[in-house]
Amino acid sequence: MGGKGADWSRRAILAGLASALAACSPGSLQWGSRSFSLPWGGDNGGGGGLSPIASAPKERFGRGRVNVALLLPLSGNAALSQLGQSLANASKLAIGFIEANPNIGENITISLRDTGDSAAGATSAANAAVVEGVKLILGPLTAEQVTAAGNVARAAGIPLIGFANNGSVAGPGVYVLNVLPETEMKRAVRYLRDQGRRGPAGIFPATPYGEALATAFRQQAIAAGFNPSAVYTFSSISEAQQIIDQAKPLIERGMIDALFIPDRASAATFAGLLAQAGVTNETVQLVGSADWAHDAGLLRNPALAGATFPAVDEAGLNAIRADYAARFGGNPPQMATIAYTATILANVNTLSLATPPYEANLLTNPAGFAGRDGLFRLYADGRSDYALVIKQIGTGGIVTTADGARI
């Protein structure tokens, strides 16, 4: 349950690491240029032999009168179900916080339901939650499952807050609470602008993950007032030298003074080739992604000293770490704070006790909400904004906060 070997990043699970989850143990997973689709749950929602999801909740916790469903994978693929149980634990921790605080009303009861590892399982769990009369659905995890459960919830007029980091599955009434590609790109691009950089460019893998980041980079760079000078894509790392050769003249002319290399698997290669070409961090600011945050090998790479990247403020995770370990054993995964935040959000008086509860205009309050990781907002199109810090890699892999948490 998030213990030894379970170094889960948000993108690792939610971007859908099909090949990695199929072939690796949790301790050996490598993130980076991966697909947004998991191998289980195609168009027909096949579950790879998954048993039908039981109609009864696996568990209930909380003592409030408003029924809220929490849909998570608790069976099926071992890696995914391990994360699902950890997020269920984080939700229980949030309920425990509510119950222990006399200044917070106990408004909700959580009904925990198993989605298994398929779209069909998510549909089944969502249907059972609707029959039970829930007012809000939290989860599921993957993009395919959020889509499946979201279709059920939307038809029933029940809002759903899923945990995928793929904004394409969001829509009116179906929200995604996570760090989306556009969120981290907006944070990083605006930081570059504030630092006086004028020519951002990017190198992205030709994968669904890379394409989503590339699209977000273009959109957010233009929104920040930049005219992106170059956007490169690659299908194989063997193309890296060619890309650097193409970028070098633009760097020399000052047209590129910041370069996004967000893909974990290739970042060190590109940084090394730039160093060999005589490009320093003073000339070109290297920028990574939130996916870099816990890759110790990457952060210790000398070629990346001085690089920056957006990340979730770890203060929130650190604040619940001891309580989680004491109650459940092991360390909470990075995503624990999202399940914790969603549970606290569901209990908010102005949302849960409204008539009717969880109306769209309430959930999309422009002021946003204070979550375990800081400020976040939900928008009418179902997407979200999440407060991020800017981290900078120093000599020897020492990482510091260059700019505090903000949206």
Identify what each model region corresponds to.
Residues 159-161, 168-190, 231, 301-313:
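Short beta-strand elements at the ligand-binding edges of bilobed clamshell
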Residues 1-23:
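N-terminal secretory signal peptides
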Residues 327-402:
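Segments of small-molecule ligand-sensing domains
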Residues 176-233, 329:
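An alpha-beta-alpha
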Residues 85-86, 101-168, 267:
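Beta-alpha junction/loop-to-helix N-cap segments that form part of ligand/metal-binding clefts
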Residues 256, 268-340, 354:
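Extracellular/periplasmic periplasmic-binding protein-like sensory domains
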Residues 20-45:
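Bacterial Sec signal peptide processing site at the extreme N-terminus
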Residues 129-141, 161-163, 201-204, 254-266, ...:
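Periplasmic-binding protein-like
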